Amino acid sequence: QRQMCIRDRQYNIPEIGIEPGRSIVGEAGITLYEVGTIKDIPGVNKYVSVDGGMSDHIRTALYGAQYEALLVNRNEKANESVTIAGKLCESGDIIVRDAQLPSSVHRGDYLAVLSTGAYHYSMASNYNQMQKPSVFFLKDGKAREVIKRQSLRQLIINDTK
């Protein structure tokens, strides 16, 4: 009845848009990375590089956002503080500072970076010619790909015309 009264008087009914943001969807996402090179500088730091970086995880570099990472392919206790770095050859290409991982972490291991459900994909870029990653939804133990990984052809299509 109220809507009819508003329309009869030719008032516009306002529309409300909602942007869910980190508080709602942030915890719903996990980003998986494969470990590449590991560089241990005794007495300074241990760097664990992964197959992604600031092109798909920019919030640490932009805002100093903090994340937690877990080794997911083996059940071992975390006993060492490391820096998880991306592969983009930038000093700011850091995924997680002071990550707690097992000292046995090695090339080929998989790390899960938690709480990446908000903004990670929407802020992803092709910086350094990096392909945007795929996105999967999980429900009842089953994975469904909802966004395919960007192909090399898609990446360079505008550069080849």
Protein language model annotation of sequence segments:
Residues 7-11:
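Structural alpha-helical segments in enzyme catalytic/regulatory domains
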Residues 13-161:
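Charged (often Lys/Glu-rich) extended helix/loop segments that serve as interaction or gating elements
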Residues 1-6:
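Short, small-residue-biased leader/transition segments that mark boundaries at the very start
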